[in-house]
């Protein structure tokens, strides 16, 4: 019989003894301060030696052409690397890199996705956004994201589901303003474009490390940035189908700098990603659980059951 490490057992006992637990909107709501590890948990802090090990952790690295991004551009598995964290000795981070010279053939983007089995509960990730390219001239409409998505079977598919965090340091989509989008989708048609969603925008620079969190119940999506509540989405904009947890880094159509010259190279780093199935956890709860997992040297765990019947993960919608 397997046993939790000591610190996690102590946290679990604290929940049983001290936490007030209620059932609401189809999820278990764990009050602030109740930081025990949930039974259905996915956590990955990307402590892999090389990208080839990501598949064993359930990740798929996108390789090929397709939506989104510049026409003619491609997604490359080689655009995903793992490196030592210069700010935390012993820690590793996953890095997505995208570059463009303003042409489709000169554009490479990055994307990875996990298994398609996530719906209600709490999603969180710690991400480093970048306002400027690592090299090259600044100004291209780069999109830096963390999201969960179910495939679009056809235009305006009623079962389409998507939750997005998208950072636009150089603007894009008709505006030059730096902003962070928090979006919960109802449905969409790709071509010609027509979308139905509920969106929140934070007009500020988010350069550097940030923790993004989403609480999903049957009736609402609550969004938090660095522990601060920023938006609530409800009604038909709440996810209805199991989704993949995904990250991507890509260039929006329209607004790229003139073609030619040295490639403009952008990075997005990911420290960890977390999902607690069917549990609404506060930002403080998630931070406490991540600290406990790391204290017990748990670099990856996945006890979230597969969808029934199993669903094929896809890195494109």
Residue ranges, per PLM feature:
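Glycine-aromatic-enriched beta-strand/loop faces of beta-sandwich-type recognition domains
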Residues: 154-208, 255
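Low-complexity, Ser/Thr/Pro/Gly-rich disordered linker/stalk regions
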Residues: 27-140, 144-151, 271-317
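Aromatic sugar-binding interfaces of carbohydrate-active proteins
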Residues: 58, 156, 204, 220-317
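Bacterial N-terminal signal peptides
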Residues: 14-26
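Structural recognition of the beta-strand scaffold that forms the well-ordered cores
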Residues: 95, 164-166, 246-248
């Amino acid at each position: 019989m397997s046993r939790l490490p000591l610190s996690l057992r102590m946290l679990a006992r604290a929940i049983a003894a001290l936490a007030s637990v209620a059932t609401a909107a189809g999820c278990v709501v764990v009050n602030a301060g109740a930081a025990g590890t949930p039974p259905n948990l996915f956590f990955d802090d990307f402590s892999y030696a090389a990208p080839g090990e990501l598949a064993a952790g359930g990740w798929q690295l996108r390789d090929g052409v397709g939506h989104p991004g510049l026409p003619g551009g491609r997604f490359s598995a080689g655009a995903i690397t793992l490196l030592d964290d210069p700010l935390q000795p012993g820690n590793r981070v996953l890095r997505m890199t995208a570059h463009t010279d303003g042409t489709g053939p000169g554009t490479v983007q990055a994307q990875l996705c996990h298994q398609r089995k996530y719906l209600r509960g709490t999603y969180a990730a710690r991400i480093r956004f970048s306002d400027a390219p690592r090299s090259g001239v600044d100004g291209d409409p780069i999109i830096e994201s963390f999201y969960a998505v179910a495939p679009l079977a056809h235009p305006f598919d009623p079962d389409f589901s998507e939750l997005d965090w998208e950072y636009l340091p150089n603007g894009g989509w008709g505006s030059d303003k730096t902003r962070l989008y928090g979006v919960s989708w109802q449905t969409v048609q790709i071509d010609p474009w027509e979308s139905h969603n509920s969106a929140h925008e934070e007009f500020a620079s988010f350069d550097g490390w940030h923790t993004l969190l989403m609480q999903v119940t049957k009736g609402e999506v609550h969004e938090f940035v660095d522990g601060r509540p920023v938006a609530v989405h409800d009604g038909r904009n709440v996810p209805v189908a199991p989704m993949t947890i995904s990250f991507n880094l890509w260039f929006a159509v329209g607004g790229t700098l003139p073609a030619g010259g040295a490639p403009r190279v952008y990075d997005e780093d990911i420290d960890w990603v977390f999902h607690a199935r069917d549990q609404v956890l506060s930002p403080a709860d998630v931070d406490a659980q991540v600290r406990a997992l790391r204290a017990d040297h748990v670099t990856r765990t996945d006890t979230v059951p597969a969808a029934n019947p199993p669903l094929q993960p896809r890195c494109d919608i």
